[in-house]
Amino acid sequence: MQYQIERIDHQIADDRSQTGTFLIGPLERGQATTLGNSLRRVLMGGLEGSAVTAVRIAGINHEYATIPGVREDVLDILLNCKQLSINSSNPELEIGRLVASGPLDVKANDIQFSSQVEIVDGEKPIATIQEGHNLELEIHVERGVGYRPVDRKNQETTAIDLLQIDAVFMPVKRVNFSIDETAVAEGGTGRERLKMEVVTDGSTSPDDAIAEAANQLIELFQPLATVTMVEEIPEEPEPSPEAQIPLEELNLSVRAYNCLKRAQVNSVSDLMGFSYEDLLEIKNFGSKSADEVIEALERIGISIPQSRTSV
């Protein structure tokens, strides 16, 4: 069944975050929930994004310090850097730098990055420098997926003045969806429409976010469309060493031995296919000979059933 996707609203906030609202339908009953849940999960946790992962501040070696002549303390500056909406097209580490003198209200646009890094909200405040004081920053930006907490073990091996930050790479901030069950197709059969609201940090548009999420789901399900089921053939169990013992080594009487040989019984393996009743049906094979065979098998740890297995 073909369905349509319509963007019914698109807004850009003062902080450059974007909100897109989409209608998807008509869908069969139940499909809207399937689509909504799948897209929401990928949108919120599966898309790659950019984030500040570490900050170096000249003269500072721990996050609880204060900076002379700067209104904000180090924790405030780290939080402001963490909240930056950034889009880096470089899969490798990018480093931005700031050297500023007061009086100055430092904003995100004051940080110098390469052409591969775009600061979405350039007016985001970073710090306030008083007259006669300086501030030097080095900001590390990386690409990633999801949320990456500070690695405390790795932190011990990094430079003492490089302050690591819990990185939030998720470009989508919020996803809401609802289902409209009022649509009715020809013939009176029920239909659904999925209404999705996607809010991004501005580093990507809601349209691109949905497209990327859909492509990830396609890649996830594609192998299932071409899977070939191969029936496993069970391996034949290897016979036990006792089953390989030839009939001669059971030390049977001549009468019992000859009767079994005429019945094409040449080894213990052949005897294991017989029951006590089967032995009695061998020509000239009486109960005494059958008991003799049972005892010989029990001496090597093998037993056979008294009667045939019923089918």
Curated annotation (Swiss-Prot):
GO biological process: DNA-templated transcription
Catalytic activity as recorded in UniProt: RNA(n) + a ribonucleoside 5'-triphosphate = RNA(n+1) + diphosphate
Gene3D superfamilies: 5' to 3' exonuclease, C-terminal subdomain, DNA-directed RNA polymerase, insert domain, RNA polymerase, RBP11-like subunit
Alpha N-terminal domain (alpha-NTD): region residues: 1-228
Pfam families: RNA_pol_A_bac (PF01000), RNA_pol_A_CTD (PF03118), RNA_pol_L (PF01193)
Top-rank taxon, per record: Bacteria
Record's comment describing the protein's domains: The N-terminal domain is essential for RNAP assembly and basal transcription, whereas the C-terminal domain is involved in interaction with transcriptional regulators and with upstream promoter elements.
Assembly and binders: In cyanobacteria the RNAP catalytic core is composed of 2 alpha, 1 beta, 1 beta', 1 gamma and 1 omega subunit. When a sigma factor is associated with the core the holoenzyme is formed, which can initiate transcription.
The protein's name in its UniProt record: DNA-directed RNA polymerase subunit alpha
Species this protein is from: Prochlorococcus marinus (strain MIT 9312)
Gene: rpoA
